[in-house]
Amino acid sequence: PYTTLFRSALSGGNQQKVMLSRWIMTEADVFLLEEPTRGIDVGAKTEVYEAIGDCVKNQKGVVVVSSEEEEVLGICDRVIVMKNGCIAAILNAKAATTEEIKHYAV
């Protein structure tokens, strides 16, 4: 009961950070994050990005599913663009652009 009360008292951004922290504490080798920053403020997004970066530095695999092209380009090494349930392109995030992602996605 206390965890439900505590969690519900948090902002959306803090709820996201708590969930991410709980996952990291599991010491998993790979993390799958779907829209990890949806609905949270810029400050909380930065903290989530830092947590993702820490996972990568600690040799953890991180797969991010996101519709935010800028976000993906900023935190990922590779971008896999899906179209109609199939892989349309695999891009180097450091060289790719949002326009290129949209080109393959549409």
Summary of predicted features, one role per range:
Residues K60-V65:
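Conserved H-loop
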Residues V72-G74:
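A short, surface-exposed alpha-helical micro-motif characterized by mixed small hydrophobic
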Residues R78, I90:
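Short, glycine/charged-rich "phosphate-handling" switch motifs in NTP-dependent
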